[in-house]
Amino acid sequence: MATQKEKPSSNSFKWFSTKTLKLNLSFQNRRRSPKSNSSSTLNSPRSNSDDNNNIKSHQASKEELRQVFSHFDSDGDGKISAFELRHYFGSVGEYISHEAAQEAINEVDTDADGSLGFEDFVGLMTRRDLYGDGEVDGDGELKTAFEMFEVEKGSGCITPKGLQKMLVKLGESRTYGECEAMIKFYDIDGNGILDFHEFRQMMTV
């Protein structure tokens, strides 16, 4: 009987979680439009301009991924090594062993050269079934990222201060007011903070 594929350690997912969050926050912030505009076009017929916009959106997303990839690839050789992955973790105050870094890379290293190429990186950032078991994985990684944004661990919420603090660690400098605005956009109950449900909504829109 085939054994179930072992799921990797939570440390190996911090890379995926934090970088996905950085990508989503920055990219969604740029592409966001007023809600009235989005509702007025909800039932509009599909047009050529819609197709062009979709193509441009895909290209922009790819360019954004390239920028994130370059942030990891410190020596510019087109590959992310375990050393470079560890260096990134250190820059955000997280220790990760060389073994754990290599494990994270091996999970999606298609050519088995021990490092992560750009296409492997794109695959990682767009995959939903991380373990190949037919299940859509996501909450585990999102919860890990959510916890990293909590100012008070276990509080169950992300405040503007917590968002600002973590974005600085990720190299995304934002004012307190900007962080308030980002939270307000996804704050369903209007209490000025994000709970996990609202955080998931932000990440999957």
UniProtKB/Swiss-Prot annotation:
Residue ranges, annotated region (Disordered): 26-55
Q: Name the InterPro entries for this protein.
A: Centrin_CML-like, EF-hand-dom_pair, EF_Hand_1_Ca_BS, EF_hand_dom
**Repeat is among the record's keywords:** yes
User: What are the UniProt keywords, alphabetically?
Assistant: Calcium, Metal-binding, Repeat
* Superkingdom of source: Eukaryota
Q: What is the lineage of its organism?
A: Eukaryota, Viridiplantae, Streptophyta, Embryophyta, Tracheophyta
**Residues reported to bind Ca(2+) 2:** 109, 111, 113, 115, 120
Q: Which Pfam families match?
A: EF-hand_7 (PF13499), EF-hand_8 (PF13833)
Functionally, this protein is described as follows: Potential calcium sensor.
What is the name listed in the Swiss-Prot or TrEMBL entry for this protein? Probable calcium-binding protein CML41
Species assigned in the record: Arabidopsis thaliana (Mouse-ear cress)
Q: Does the keyword Coiled coil apply?
A: no
**Do you know which PROSITE patterns this protein is assigned to?**
EF_HAND_1, EF_HAND_2
Q: Which parts of the sequence bind Ca(2+) 1? A: 73, 75, 77, 79, 84
Residues involved in Ca(2+) 3 binding:
187, 189, 191, 198
- In this chain, composition skew of type Low complexity spans 35-54
- Disulphide linkage map: none
Domain EF-hand: from-to ranges: 60-95, 96-131, 137-173, 174-205
Could you state a single Gene Ontology molecular function term? calcium ion binding
